[in-house]
C-alpha cells in the first residue's frame, strides 16, 4: 500500500464526484482491542456522528469482546440511543474488548469472510501497539477486497508517540493516558493527606505501565511524591567510578552500565533516612509497574525465560506452564537445561551463572518471573509484586543502617526540652550525652550512632556520668530514645485497572471525539493502513490538526514468543525531555527532607468547566514549553 501521512483539511470547492463519494452510504465496523482506556466511547460517538451527518443511512457495527467478535461473527449495530448513553463515559462497556490477535492466515481469512458478510467498507481497530500492528497487516490483507482498515491509538501507558524524520511530533500521546494519570494522581494525593495526618506509613504506589514510565512521570508531576523511580533513567545510568577503576585494572566492568537492584534499593533508602532525620518517618513513593525491565540483571532473566518458554511451547504438545505447574517443577527444568549443557558441552540459553543468580532471588519473585506470558508473548509486569521485590531489599538495608546507628528519627529540640523538664531532668546535662548534634542549632536532634539499643543507651549514660551502673534509665530518657527508633511501616497500592475504567477528562473526551471524526474523514477519502491522530495536542484546541499516519513505517523487529516479529515501536520516556528535566530538578525539593511542610500537590477532582480543568497532560505542556524556548533562541 503506497501510504503517506494524510493531512485532513476542509475542501474549499469540492467537485461533484468528491461530494458523491463523501456522502455515500457506508457500512463500517469498529472493534476495541486490548485493555480499556477512558475515551473509547467518544471515538465511537465521533465516528457515528460524522458518518450519520454524511449519510444518515450508513451503518456502524460494533464487534463484541474485541477481535473475537470479528472471528466469531459476533456483532451488533450501534444506534443513536446507545451512542448518547455512552458519551463521555469511561470503560469499553458498550461493545466490550478482548486480547485475541488475528495473526495467522486462517484467522485473516476468517476475519475477511465475516467482514464481507456485513458488506463492510471499512474496519476500525481501536487499540495499542500490538492492535495497531494487527491493523497494518489486516489493511494489507483486506486491500484487494476493497475493505479499508484504520487504527486508533489507545493505551493508558502513553507509549504510542510518533515523530516524523525531522523530529516533528505527529502523535504526542495515545488517548486514555491523561484520564488514567489524573485518576491515579487524585488517589495518591489522598494518600499524601493521610500520610501527613498519622505520620507513620510509607505508601508505596505502583503505577501501571508495562514498559515505559510515562504514567509514572505524569503522576509525579501531578502529585510531587517524595521518592519516584523512572525506569528509563536506570537504563541510562553509568557508574563512572566503576569504569575508571576497571580502566586502571585493564578490564571492562559491564555492571557499570545501568542500575542494579541493589543500587535502586540504596537510592530509596537514602531518601527514607534523610526524611527520618528531620522527623518525617512517612512518605509517598511512586514506582512504575515495568521498572524492573530497566534493571540489567532482571532484563536478562526476562529475555532468557521468554525464549525458553517459547521454545518449549513450540516443540511440545503440552505448554510449559501445564507441564511444570509448580515453582519447583520449573526450577528443576531450568537445572536440567544447565546439566545437559555441561554434559553435552553445548551452548544453552540458561547457564550455570544464570541458575545461581536466579536461585538467590526470593521464591515469590522467581514465581513472578516464570509466570505465564500474555497472548502477545509479553511478560506481565502487573502480575509481579515489583514493590515487594524492591521494598524487601530496602527493608533489609534499613535494618543494617539501623543496627549501624545511621537510621534515626530526628527529635524536635522543643519537645525534648519539654519532655525532660516535665520529668524534672536537666535537658542540657543529658543533651550532649544523647545527641551527636546537641547545641549546634540544628532543627532536629539526632541520637548518637553508638546508641542502638537500651544496653548501649545505658552505657552512654553511665559513661557520661548521668546515671550509675546500678541505676535504671530514667523513663523520660527512655521515651526520647524510643521516639528516635524508626519503625518502618509500608502500605502497598497498585494503580492500573481503576484508571483504565475511569471517566475521561475533558482533554480525552475532546481528543477521542475528534479522533472519531478523523477516522471517518480518512475512510471517506479512501485511506487504509493509517492510524488516526491529532497534531498539536499540546496547543490550544483551535490549533489541533487531524491527520492520518501510515502504520507500517512505525514498526520494528521485536522478540515475541522467542521469535523476531514486526510490531509497532513503543515510545519510552526521553531522559533529555523538558518534562523529565523538570522532575529531576525538583527531586530534592519534593523529597522535603527538611522540618518545613511537605511539597505535595493536590491536583483536585476531574472537572469539565471552570478555571482549573487541567486541560492537558503536564508532560505535554512542559515539553511544548521546552520546544518553544529552543525555537525562540
Model-derived regions: residue spans:
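Glycine-rich oxoanion-binding loops at beta->alpha junctions
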Residues: 1-21, 70-121, 166-168, 172-189
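Short, ordered loop/turn segments at secondary-structure junctions
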Residues: 33-35, 63-69, 99-100, 128-129, ...
